[in-house]
Amino acid sequence: MAALDSVEKMMSDIQYPIKGSCQCGNIRYQLLAPPLKIMACHCKACQKLSTSAFSITALVKADSLVVQGELAQWERLAESGNKNYAKFCPYCGNRIYHFNPDQPETIKLKAASLDDTRILNPEAHIWVCQKQDWYQIPEGVPQFDKQP
């Protein structure tokens, strides 16, 4: 219980807006409000994107993100069947967020691009059916085989 209290205290100390950027600094943005959810995605596409075992995604309201700079776009059909459009820096290639055009009210911010990364504490792990065997999800954190 003390660990949960510590996380809640840390999250309440975060001041919005939080600034973020791509690797080269061409794209800058501000997150104006707390995310709706923070998830760790273990799908193979996110493993390739992050070049790691999973990618951290913050589900945010679209109107809570203000972007400076011109983003490029890439599109694909996700394994879940959802449309997955990616916005990224055309210079360094760093992904900033994903979105589904059928759900324009929310976007999936690649939250490791934030300057203050204290919010990167996943509330759930998704696509664990594709998880790396060596990675152990912390006890008590909800997990889903695919997209909940």
What do the PLM-derived regions correspond to, one by one?
Residues 2-148:
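A short Gly-Trp-Pro
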